């Protein structure tokens, strides 16, 4: 059983959602990435989404765009991101790591080379925001052949055909975008989102993670009543961006994530 599958089985038995914080590789510094990953786990993260910096992150709001720009200005490349995952794995063999980014850098490396390097490094899942399931069948097969889950996005506007395609192509979990817009946007109608996710559960047969617009423990607790996982991105990236040193960033990450982790652990998921 894969790390991601094992995590969701474990948390289903525990009756709670997973907390998955997002951070951009190489931000706020090159030396901070691996220590921050360990800090997130220590603070209560169940899995980590690690952003692969890209020059045109069209689905990301200003916070993550700026983080990508800072990381790229420091010279971050895709192979460096994979090396950081490999380094993380030398002392953590249990926490799932999901890479999130865009297709262009992966295509530049070559999907087969990328999948092989990612599998060797210890990556568990890959989300390519601009790769639709209809266009990503080949990439999904290559990833799955190497034990990596291809994770696709669904949105409030996704129709039955897209849902069916994701059901047949995706694995690991499905990332449900709670807002029509970019990451970091203000507020969703959470009752509507959770109703939609409940409907998707019946259709997909895969865990559903909810992301976009989740910034605090109260919202995490609300979303955790109906999601299999809660993703927090821009709010954490903002905290890290304000730090002048690696130690400040580590302390800020722990301070920010601990109450979010407490929120998922104290919230019973309906239907768990």
Curated annotation (Swiss-Prot):
Pfam families: Trp_syntA
Major enzyme class: lyase
Pathway: Amino-acid biosynthesis; L-tryptophan biosynthesis; L-tryptophan from chorismate: step 5/5
EC nos: 4.2.1.20
Active-site residue list: 49, 60
Assigned GO CC terms: cytosol
Record SUPFAM superfamilies: Ribulose-phoshate binding barrel (SSF51366)
Gene3D superfamilies noted in UniProt: Aldolase class I
Keyword Flavoprotein in record: no
Keyword field: Amino-acid biosynthesis, Aromatic amino acid biosynthesis, Lyase, Tryptophan biosynthesis
GO MF annotations, alphabetized: tryptophan synthase activity
Catalytic activity from the UniProt record: (1S,2R)-1-C-(indol-3-yl)glycerol 3-phosphate + L-serine = D-glyceraldehyde 3-phosphate + L-tryptophan + H2O
Family: Belongs to the TrpA family.
Function, as annotated: The alpha subunit is responsible for the aldol cleavage of indoleglycerol phosphate to indole and glyceraldehyde 3-phosphate.
Complex and partners: Tetramer of two alpha and two beta chains.
Protein's name according to its UniProt entry: Tryptophan synthase alpha chain
Organism name: Acidithiobacillus ferrooxidans (strain ATCC 23270 / DSM 14882 / CIP 104768 / NCIMB 8455) (Ferrobacillus ferrooxidans (strain ATCC 23270))
